């Protein structure tokens, strides 16, 4: 699920739909997630193309932070501080559980690490990340989990330098 969400985000960054590291759970992102899912996973008897699970659970990765709907005003009032993530930043599953409506009500957006987002601005880095995500997590491995996703994301600045 996380690889599919990242591929959808990469596509929307490339098409200039996503222009900043604040990733909202928009209809366009949901649609793109489903398109990517169908392309690589097809119809699965085990999994369904549910964007809410990776959108929520990616907060356990060091590059993804959920921002609560009520946190936005406090963040705007506070002084600008560097992007950082603490365990205290982890959010609880919203009332209504895993539904797009519940996620939208609970979270204003997910914030991607600025460094990672900057890397995604590079066409070659996007292409390389796509290949890695597809080959490692989506090709003939429908049930493989992503234990090394954080390491992969932290290596992206090096990939961008090579590209």
List the predicted regions and their residue ranges.
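Mixed-charge, low-complexity interaction segments
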Residues: 1-162
